[in-house]
């Protein structure tokens, strides 16, 4: 959920913003997803856990590995703490926040994180293209845990589902001639 905020700037203009608001059930679910993934190191096992425990999305659907990965990689859940600051700096993220704002309490807001094109699936941009600020919302996942999960996901990238590669395809062919 989000809450509308407005303030008056020095030059008298009204600045409007949105503040993310916590929804207790969703916060608990996000914590569970991170916890299970950190324990198992597997998107499939996390998916299986959520299925067995009847955890569903806010639209009432079953989670997919893709959706779980989306939650695990979304920095909005990360607490803006020392570890988060170091990680973002090391990854050359464009920070629009002072070091002091990484107070161990608030969450991260990341902009320009995805490339969205009509008719195409959204793509995650390289971190160097992100624009990151400290939000007004409370963070949920400690920076160290979020960073650890990113490292675990990087290790698992080679196992990620893409298009199946079959050894049979090059051997099969269609012949329209009647030659024998």
Residue ranges and their predicted role:
Residues 1-180:
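Conserved catalytic breakage-reunion loop centered on the nucleophilic residue
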């Amino acid at each position: 959920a989000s809450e509308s905020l407005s303030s008056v700037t020095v030059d008298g203009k009204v600045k409007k913003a949105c503040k993310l608001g916590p929804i207790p059930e969703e916060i608990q679910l996000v914590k569970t997803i991170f916890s299970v993934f950190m324990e198992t190191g597997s998107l499939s096992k996390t998916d299986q856990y959520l299925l067995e425990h009847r955890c569903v999305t806010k639209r009432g659907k079953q989670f997919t590995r893709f959706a779980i990965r989306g939650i695990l990689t979304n920095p909005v859940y990360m607490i803006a703490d020392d570890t988060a600051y170091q990680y973002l700096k090391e990854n050359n993220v464009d920070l629009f926040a002072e070091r002091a704002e990484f107070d161990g309490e608030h969450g991260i807001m990341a902009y320009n994180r995805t490339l969205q094109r009509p008719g195409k699936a959204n793509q995650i941009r390289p971190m160097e293209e992100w624009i990151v600020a400290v939000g007004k919302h409370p963070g949920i996942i400690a920076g160290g845990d979020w960073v650890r999960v990113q490292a675990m996901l990087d290790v698992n990238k080679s196992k990620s589902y893409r298009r199946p590669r079959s050894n049979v395809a090059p051997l099969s062919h269609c012949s329209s001639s009647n030659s024998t």
